[in-house]
Structures are given as C-alpha cells and as structure tokens.
C-alpha cells in the first residue's frame, strides 16, 4: 500500500493517524509548523474526547515513533517546501483547513506528493463521499476533497432515500458539536458575528454548505436540498435531521426497512442502523459516516418525513479519509 503524509496535526490530522493504524495503512510523515515532535507525542497520546492512545508513542531522534514505526516530522509553513518524497509519502492528507482549493493544495505536489486529499469541502476540487460516488474518481485527478463530516453523514442516507422513494425536495438541520474554529468566550469572528459567541454557553445558528454539497456527489439531488446548523456545547458527535418530501409514498416502516437493508449490504460500514434508545455520547469513536436512528424519525404522511442520523464528526470522518485513499490507491 502506498505511503501517506499528513499536513496539519490538529483534531482531524491526529485522528486520521489513529484511523490509519486501525486500518493497517502506513503514515510515514507529518508536517506541522506550530508544534514540535514532543508536543506531537503528547497530543497524540492523550485525547480528551477519544481517550488515551492504546499503543505506544514516543519521540526518538526527531522522529515521531508510533507502535515502533518511525514517522518523519516536518515543520514547514509553506506546503511547497515539504519534502514528502524524502519520506516516501505519496498520498498527502491536507488537514490544516487552510489549503482547500486545487491551486493551494497542489503545492504539495512540488515536494513529491502524487495525490492530495483535502479533509474539508473544496470550492473547486472534485468531492467524494465513500459509499456514494467513488465511481466518479479517475486516476488523472491529483487533488480531491473528502467533503465535510456532515455531507458524509447526509449523502449516504439521502442516496438510500432517493434511490428507493425519490426525494422531491428537502431541508437539513445538523445539530453540531463544537469545533476548533469556535470561541471559548465571546470574541470577534469576521463577518459571521454569531459564530464568535462563546461555544460553551450558547446554541448558535450557523451556515453549512453540507446539504447543497450533496448535489455535487449525487447530481440527481442538485438544487433539491439545502440546510443549516446549530452549534451546541458538546465536544463531539453531531446529528442530522433530514426532512424531505418524497415522490413515492411510503410508510415509515418501509423507509426503515430500506435503510436497514442498505446498512447490511452496499453501505455496510458507512451507514449504520440502530433501533435502540441512544443519545449522542453513545457514538463517541463510532467509525460509521452516519448511523440512522430508527426510533427518532417521524412521518407526517406517506410523502413527508423527518429522518435522523448520528455521526462522530471527528472519528467517523477520519476513517473515511483513509477509506478514500485506499480506494484511490486501488485505481491509480
């Protein structure tokens, strides 16, 4: 399997490394100009949300050593200066949140990377959601996007519903856990004034492009979905509320049956299904993109339904980054 590099050792960067270890993928290099190797060891070892790393991690001779495997550490601010080739890294995960366009992310190619996977939505890079549109990938693509955690939750569910019952139109709300871009106390936040309010004190209405992005990965739904977010004071796990008008009438039990069928078949490991009395903490470190909550959804009539699906917005997403890379490697 080709070797992986990670640019940006933040929440997603560190969890992509954990996911890579779980899935037997090889990470050979990490770049982060803001933390040295000893700090990397500390941040990787201890995680307030997902718990202590269960393997071994140490700093040795300037390397980050995880489970006995040496990982080269770079400290470059400009991606063009990262010598990925020297570490053998061919697939680079761009997880700084800064270099999210083809132009900016392509600078990794100068250092020897062959492919770049942006762990965020992109304005112009082709977007992929595992279980939904991987067949649109072609080996000539140098820079791709793994979309957002919310799009990864919504798209598999929307695909099942649209394939079986036809989505005429719909609105999505994600009740979303706090992320690093928010403020611990009230502060300035550019043009997005509400986003600057204290994360621990407030339910904050916010914009999200996640629903519209589904139209990019499922062209049949282009223009049929939009949505918004509420940021809430929890550290992790979010939940999508998808309210849709259907073209083909169906009982809620029929909808549940199709989702459960998909969760055991073509979308196994991507879309989960539960009929238990769950709450958000039950999904900490869950590796699915989306877990349909059969008991939480409701229908007004046979063509108007509200569907609920949970996601670990950090770890589920990080696992999909590795899955996308593995798929790309199988085709390149």
Swiss-Prot record:
Belongs to the glyceraldehyde-3-phosphate dehydrogenase family. Pathway: Carbohydrate degradation; glycolysis; pyruvate from D-glyceraldehyde 3-phosphate: step 1/5. One of its GO terms (cellular component) is Z disc. InterPro entries: GlycerAld/Erythrose_P_DH, GlycerAld_3-P_DH_AS, GlycerAld_3-P_DH_cat, GlycerAld_3-P_DH_NAD(P)-bd, Glyceraldehyde-3-P_DH_1, NAD(P)-bd_dom_sf. Homotetramer. It catalyses: D-glyceraldehyde 3-phosphate + phosphate + NAD(+) = (2R)-3-phospho-glyceroyl phosphate + NADH + H(+). The active site is at 149 (nucleophile). D-glyceraldehyde 3-phosphate binds at residues 148-150, 179, 208-209, 231. Signal peptide: none annotated. Changing residue 284 to V: In strain: VT37, HFL15 and HFL3. Its EC number is 1.2.1.12. One of its GO terms (biological process) is glyceraldehyde-3-phosphate metabolic process. It is an enzyme of class 1 (oxidoreductase). It comes from the Eukaryota. The gene is Gapdh1. CDD domains: GAPDH_I_C, GAPDH_I_N. The record marks 176 as: Activates thiol group during catalysis. PROSITE patterns: GAPDH (PS00071). Its main location: cytoplasm. NAD(+) binds at residues 11-12, 32, 77, 313. One of its GO terms (molecular function) is NAD binding. The keyword Cytoplasm applies. It is found in: Cytoplasm. This is Glyceraldehyde-3-phosphate dehydrogenase 1.
